[in-house]
């Protein structure tokens, strides 16, 4: 009998924004214990859109947004199901 791996995903992201009077600043974020790759992609898009909206409301613009979904097995090891996400939400 073949046992399927029980994978979880960790979302690692970085966001850079620019305000005319401040310049460019960046931050990183992590969301862990995501149930599957689809949920990780959805969360990455939700975070990107939400942050872009907040930045624009304050008069700035998003310079860069990157996200990476890292698959981990039950022991916490990275496995070959990880992927980078690119969105054109800028």
How does the language model describe each region?
Residues 36-51:
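Short, well-ordered alpha-helical segments
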Residues 23-39:
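A short, exposed loop/beta-hairpin motif centered on an aromatic-Gly-Thr core
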Residues 49-90:
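Short, mixed-charge low-complexity intrinsically disordered segments
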């Amino acid at each position: 009998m073949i046992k399927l791996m029980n994978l979880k995903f960790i979302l690692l992201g970085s966001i850079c924004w620019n305000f005319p009077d401040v310049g460019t600043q960046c931050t990183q974020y992590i969301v862990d214990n995501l149930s599957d790759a689809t949920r990780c992609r959805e969360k990455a898009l939700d975070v990107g859109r939400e942050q872009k909206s907040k930045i624009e409301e304050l008069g700035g613009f998003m310079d860069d947004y990157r996200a990476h979904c890292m698959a981990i097995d039950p022991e916490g090891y990275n496995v070959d199901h990880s992927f980078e996400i690119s969105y054109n939400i800028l």
